[in-house]
Amino acid sequence: MARYTGPSCRLCRRENTELFLKGERCYTDKCAIKRRNYPPGQHGQGRSKTSDYGVQLREKQKVRRIYGILENQFRGYFERADRLKGVTGENLLFLLERRLDNIVYRLGFASSRIEARQLVRHGHFTLNGKKVTIPSIQVKTGDTVELREKSRKVASINESLEAVVRRGIPQWLELDKGAFKGSVKTLPVREDITMPIQEQLIVELYSK
């Protein structure tokens, strides 16, 4: 499945929730879903009731788009989550939260996960002192993510760090803003993920 390259705001309207795909714009009145809270398209305001399967599919698509994951990769995360001990749906969210690009976003180095992924791929960060360029790396407790010295004057990164107060930093992470680095204090728990996600719907979809 190809990566979506169309307008990001249409995805938020399609899923009827804020996916925070456009950085700071999503926190302003310019956010499309605040202005037009209905699906895109000619018949967006008059669509009929969705089936159970449709509801499950939309939830899966929503989570996929929040984290910017392609279908095959997302299914791979689900299969891995299903093999782990614990609740499959929660395991899935934990695996997605522990992606390096998500950590970069959560710490405030980027205004969106899309931007965070680009920054990682372009080699702006180190993980435990080593340069990394793979956004999907899974972090673990005690890991340290640091912005490389040569990247500390990048305007967009500094602007994101200044604005991080708006969305806050999860309790399981710690940011040393002055040193341009953050660390993983502990692994996330379900209460740390405050986005409106019903992961059980995804489990039901993939279990058919």
Swiss-Prot record:
SUPFAM superfamilies: Alpha-L RNA-binding motif. One of its GO terms (cellular component) is small ribosomal subunit. GO terms for molecular function: rRNA binding; structural constituent of ribosome. SMART domains: Ribosomal_S4, S4. Residues 98-158 form the S4 RNA-binding domain. CDD domains: S4. One of its GO terms (biological process) is ribosomal small subunit biogenesis. Keywords: Ribonucleoprotein, Ribosomal protein, RNA-binding, rRNA-binding. InterPro entries: Ribosomal_uS4, Ribosomal_uS4_bac-type, Ribosomal_uS4_CS, Ribosomal_uS4_N, S4_RNA-bd, S4_RNA-bd_sf. Part of the 30S ribosomal subunit. Contacts protein S5. The interaction surface between S4 and S5 is involved in control of translational fidelity. Belongs to the universal ribosomal protein uS4 family. One of the primary rRNA binding proteins, it binds directly to 16S rRNA where it nucleates assembly of the body of the 30S subunit. With S5 and S12 plays an important role in translational accuracy. This is Small ribosomal subunit protein uS4. It comes from Geotalea daltonii (strain DSM 22248 / JCM 15807 / FRC-32). The lineage of its organism: Bacteria, Pseudomonadati, Thermodesulfobacteriota, Desulfuromonadia, Geobacterales.
